[in-house]
Amino acid sequence: APELSDLNVVMSGRGYMPMRLTHWKAEWMQKSGSFDWEYPQWPGMECDGRKWCREELLDFYKPWKEMADAGNIVHIGECGCYNKVSNETALAWYKDFFSVMNELNFGYALWNFRGPFGIAEHGREGTNWEVKNGIKFDKDLYKLFVEGMKK
């Protein structure tokens, strides 16, 4: 929203694009067709008039980057990939998403730490788990998350 750029505010957005990947088979999205969507691939899935990949994520966040370039702080206050897609697909999406956030210098936060969008106990099959203090962590997602915060 360029009309807001001179207000010197923190802008908070969401990190769920493309929704057909991040919310595939999400129960609360069933009326929107989440159970009927084709299985999402990353990169390369086609929806919303785009062939999604890292470059499309950069393009999607271009208006937010313009806000940041105008002197505003941008924070993607919720993001993540629901646990119904394969771990391989989720990790590929997270890798690109985190790298885009890092490149744009945007802060971000996962929807949850522990649970279906989180780093801990999300329940995706094929996960490389590590247990610390009784909590199951996705080692690969944790590594991507930490690397994504580095410049």
What label would you give each PLM region?
Residues 1-104:
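Extracellular glycoside hydrolase catalytic/binding regions
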Residues 86-151:
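Aromatic-rich peripheral "rim/lid" segments of glycoside hydrolase catalytic domains that contact
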